[in-house]
Amino acid sequence: MEEFENFFSQLIPAPDQDIWLLAAQQTPQNNDGVSTSGIPIGWSLQNLAASTNNIAAIDSNPQIREQLQQLQQQQQQQQTQIQQQLQSYQQQQQQHYQQRQQQYQQQYQQPYTTPSPPDQIDYNQQLSPQQQQQQQQQQQQQQQQQQQQPQLQQQNNTISQQQQQQNLNFQVQFLQQQQQHQQQLQQQQEQFQHQQLQHQQQQYFIKQQLQQQQQQQQQQQQQQQQQQQQQQQQQQQQQQQQQQQNQHLSPILSPLPPIQQLQQYQQQQQQQQQQQQQQQQQQQQQQPQQQSINIGSSNTPLQHQAMLQAQSLMDSINTKQPPIPPTLQSPTQHQFLNTPVLDQHILSSIRPSYSQVTKANISTLPTEITNSLTNFNGTNNSTPNFEDLTGGKLSSNNIKNTATPLSSPPSTKNGKQKQPKNNNNNNNSSNNNNNNNQTTTQQKQSKNNNSYGNNSNNNNNNNNFNNNKLKKQNDSTTTPTITSPNMTSPIDSNGDFDLLDEDEKKKSISRINQNLASRNYRQRRKEYIKEIESKMAALTFENHQLKKENESLKETGGVEVMRPEPELITMVVEGKQIIIQLSQALKKNDDRSLIYLLHLYHCAIAKRYSIVEREVEKIVHPYTQSKLAAMGYIPKSDKMFLNCIAGPAADSWFQLFKNEAEITLEQSNKLEALRTQHGKIDSALLQERQELDLDIKKFYYTKILVLPNNPLIIGDIPAQPYNGELSQSPISNSPLEISQLLDFAGKLESLKKNFILHRNLMLDTLASLSSILTPRQEAMLLVRVHFYTSYDFSHMELLKDVWTNIVSSKSITGPLNISEALKKLSDTTNTHHSIENIVKPPQFHQYTPKQLKFENQSNNFGNNNGSKSKNIENNLNNSVNNNNNNNNNNNNNNNNNNNNNNNNNNNNNNNNNSNSNNNNNVNSNSSNVNSNNNNFNNAPQMVLNPPSADAIPYPSTTQLDKRFQWVSYPSAPPPN
């Protein structure tokens, strides 16, 4: 007991001592360089101290911290476990001690006393025999304990060694983890440095690109500045030249009247403003700061002068005082009034109030201004050279007529004036004429005061006429020259104006009004045409969208629903290929290949459940059901899909098959039970389907298809198969309730389940045959019957043809005509088929639409069957043509239980009459004959080669017989 306590007390560390340093204490070493405790020399306290330093460096990593915390928690858990073990051991020892005391009391009936030390024992005392026995037992126990002590010591040593090894392994793992963390940190540092280098390189490249872009922008800015400086220099030179010319011409020239100036320079102002706006936009994109500086420095003096001149003009007009005469003005004012650049600024400053001033103040102009206007018209026979709106110079008549007297009229040619050749001569002549003009103006002012009213009206008319001509000449001619009738108007020798006659005035006024009216009419006509074109474009777009929607509805509404799934066709073709190989294996008696081929056949048809569900979803769709109800289609009793197994028609045939396949009594009993069970379930499903179809038709005819041509109102054919039940249901136009819609949806869902159950019943019956028959018997059944893979697509194709003819026809057909066509189709599908038609041989071509005629001609099953199928198809096509072309005159004659359709259309002269062997007269249009020939010529090639003679189950004996024969059945009904 004490030894165990000492051992465990050594294992428990002190609170200030780390448990991991116990195993690292220095121990005496052997010659091999390994310590007695099993720790190598390399693991010393120094290495551990270095590792702790590394740990302190790694403490910054949160992952390592979490791991260290986990390790500490594990250490604490181990300590608690050891303490719990010690406590449990002590408790066990105490319990064992108490049990021994109780045993002692029971045996000796005395309380247990602790033994005295060996010195106090009296050896001379005589012991009783019981005591002697006890002593002997104690001695034996002591001997046993002494013998067990080395074993316990060995166990303790082994336990201590194991713990030491565990501690060492844990330390090694811990150090390895530290090294791994250090390596990961180094790798992360290297990756981070590599990313920094990449980032620095990218920044360096970006800086270089930015510097290059900045240099390019600076170069562009410098080029633009140079261009602007050149333009400014050119403008300054032009202004200086104009000022020099105006200084020479200022004493000669008198200023134009303000109204005429405003009218002439209005267009010039608009064009220049547009140019300035374009330049400002370009400069704002490139140099927004330089723009403000250059514009402010170049235009401030001009704007100041323009504002002063505008104020003087406005004051003179409002106060009805004449402006300062040009002779009293300063040279700067002469320059201001005569330079076109300054006139532009005047117009720009007074442009907003121009229309108001002209309307309000023309009638109240002072007499002095009117006199100046009349004097200007009389004396100013020449105009100075000044810049036009577009920048060109106008020629002056005065310069040209310097050698002639003042009374002579100016010479013009085609309304255009010639520019002078010598500017020096022009300047001299203008100076000479200026003095004469100044003397005559003052004398004529007093004369013209009385004639202010007449002259003002004439001047206004002339100014309007001049402005219209100026606009036309600016639009039509490329040269910037402008001529006015004031300059070319005839004048007297005294310089007076010859007044226009009243007729000429009326003509000029009417001409101006006509021009304005025609211009307004042209503008309104253009706007109206644009509106009509936009409306037409919107209507064409809408019409195009409606056409697309109608085409998509036609495709998804009827034609595609009638077409079988491509997956179904591929499954049928695969089944046909496998059955051809089964027939070959039967001839060769190869049982192994039969089993393999049957397995392939069942795998190929394993997809039938999903395909059936998709086909049923198409048929049960509410849109398809509404189409069928609108057409008046009624589902007849379905032809038995498994007529070869179930039904009374298969009794005789099935008995022959049993004899040929050597079916046992047990197999025949199972087959008969399967047939009866199939018939019961099939009849129950058919009855349920008829009830559901009746309810759905009632819902459509009473709630949705409430039309004038409703079959219930007219008493049409669709109510007859239901025994008049549909006609008894009331018709209502009230809106549908939610309960009615839910009930209708539930009926559609139950119809879908009925279809799926019926199809799965057929397919499950086929699968259950394989569990009853042997592989050879099943192969014989599939090859002889081949009912599943000989899926007859003729009825589906005929339905598709009927629907496509209805959709593609131009004339509108009602649901009554469609119902008649479909009734005939349903009558043909319900004919009683013989066993020869049911038991078909395998077809050796892939199914494609529009191939029925080629199929009937290529497979020689008898002339009667071929002519019968042709008659049925031609009758259906002719019935559709009759319903489309002759809605009013439909004459149907029935002869020899066959439909003979006669086209009574006066416009169609292409009627082909053909007499069959069974006295069946079938008339078809030329379009139908051509379609038959085209289908025969353009038939697709066969996918599979025809089988060899060995593969045929019953080879023909003669050429006139059928290619594939079956045993003649005496009880089979004759073909119709």
Swiss-Prot record:
Main location: nucleus
Domain annotation bZIP: ranges: 504-567
InterPro entries per the UniProt record, alphabetical: bZIP, bZIP_sf
One cellular component (GO) term of this entry: nucleus
Start-end of Polar residues biased regions: 374-385, 393-411
GO process terms (BP): regulation of gene expression
PROSITE patterns with a match to the protein in the record: BZIP
Coiled coil: 57-110, 136-287
Region (Basic motif): 505-507
Gene3D superfamilies attached to this UniProt entry: 1.20.5.170
Keyword Metal-binding among record annotations: no
Region (Disordered) residue spans: 104-128, 374-499, 855-957
A GO MF term: sequence-specific DNA binding
SUPFAM superfamilies: Leucine zipper domain
Highest taxon listed in the record's lineage: Eukaryota
Location within or outside the cell: Nucleus
Bias type Low complexity, positions: 420-468, 476-490, 855-938
Record key words, sorted: Coiled coil, DNA-binding, Nucleus, Transcription, Transcription regulation
Record region (Leucine-zipper): 509-516
Its job: Probable transcriptional regulator.
Family per record: Belongs to the bZIP family.
This protein's name: Probable basic-leucine zipper transcription factor Q
Organism of derivation: Dictyostelium discoideum
Protein encoded by which gene: bzpQ
